[in-house]
Amino acid sequence: KAILSEVALLTNKPVIYAANMSDEDFSNGIDSNEGYKAVQKIAAEEHAGVLPLCAQIEEEIVEMDKEEKEMFLADMGLEESGLDRLIKECYALLGLISYLTAGKQEVRAWTIKKGTKAPQAAGKIHSDFERGFIRAEVIAYDDLIACGSMTAAKEKGLVRSEGKDYVMKDGDVVLFRFNV
């Protein structure tokens, strides 16, 4: 498997099926949909994933503001949109995670492989960050949101100083310290 992963054969890539259905079929319950059952059967044979969604509903959701979107999803018995679920499933299937960096002018998400250590994650931003890595100041996204600011999070002792062996976690908010 390790040798084949270097070749990048299309037939050896992980697969997830996005099963698009009408809004009526989606609303009435996906398990009663014969087309969805057929896709599930194929996916099971191929050891692939299946994600049911409705492109028509997704198109409507994109046009909504945050509050309206949350109400709409709750009425449908969903916690998140199909697009959000598809992105999460694809990240999981490919073994990817995201971490965030935040400055005065920009907040940015960076995609890395699960299991990446802090210096290599810093290298995604710039090779100098990896080469001169000193430490990473890290806080979980949810903790930062709960505190309201990095300053408040530091006062509560929630910002950790991590070294070269720190394995990045999905949702980490990071400030890399480096010297070149």
Functional labels for PLM-detected ranges:
Residues 1-169, 174, 179:
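C-terminal-of-GTPase-core extension/linker across diverse P-loop GTPases
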